[in-house]
Amino acid sequence: MANLKSLAKDTAIYGLSSIVGRFLNYLLVPVYTIALPASGGGYGVVTNVYAWVALMMVILTCGMETGFFRFANNGKDEPMRVYSTTLFTVGGFSLIFLIIGLAFLHPIAGWLGYEEHPWYLGMMMMVVAMDAFQAIPFSFLRYQKKALRFASLKLLFIFLNITLNLIYYVRMNGHDVGKAFLINLICTSFIMVCMIPELRGFKYVFDKELNHRMMQNVRLFSGNEGKKMV
């Protein structure tokens, strides 16, 4: 009974933080719509860039947060070894993505139609790399059943993001589209600093054999999900 109560409590916290987060983020839509000039692309620039962000997040994490849960709970592999290996894998993917993205920033910006504002994409590449990496510590918090810590970090990002947007676009009457991406970068970086406790206190190891099994599991899971969608 105690386990059921704990599960119900954690589920409620995760669910509430997600619902509240989505609702608060929707509050930024009218702010952007009014503040961003249509001549510069307006809110369309923000939505277009964030669409690419969502796609790259899926590619970079490649289901490893789910794989971490599966292997950390299988009773065979040492959980902290799984966590460390997953951090190395996703961190490596994110770093490679960021290096290549910044190296070819101007060609990519031109291809996407942002040749005059390449750093819109540059800033969001940094955000994507950090967000993808942060997905693993967030999964680790769920594994540890630290629902309050999980929710507090998620909501802290949202409140900080909304506050800075309101200060610039409403209080200061700003109209620069790029500031929306800069604010996101600042908030994401702040959360990364807040996650330092989840990134220390254990031995960092990269288990090649474990990583191979995890990647196989991810490919198998992705393949099965793909078949369901067809």
Residues covered by each model-derived region:
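Signature of the first transmembrane helix
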Residues: S6-E65, S94, L98-L102, N161-I162, ...
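Alpha-helical transmembrane segments of multi-pass membrane proteins
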Residues: L55, I99, G113-P137, S152-L155, ...
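Helix-capping/transition residues at the boundaries of transmembrane alpha-helices
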Residues: T33, A109, R142, Y169-M172
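Short membrane-interface helical motifs at transmembrane helix boundaries
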Residues: I96-Y114
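Hydrophobic alpha-helical transmembrane segments
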Residues: P118, G122, A151-F202, R213
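Transmembrane-helix boundary and interhelical linker motifs in polytopic inner-membrane proteins
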Residues: L4-K5, T33-Y43, M56-V90, R142-R149
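Residue-level recognition of transmembrane alpha-helices
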Residues: Y14, S18, T47-Y50, V90, ...
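Interhelical loop/hinge segments that connect adjacent transmembrane helices in multipass membrane
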Residues: M1-L7, L148, G174-F181, V193-V230
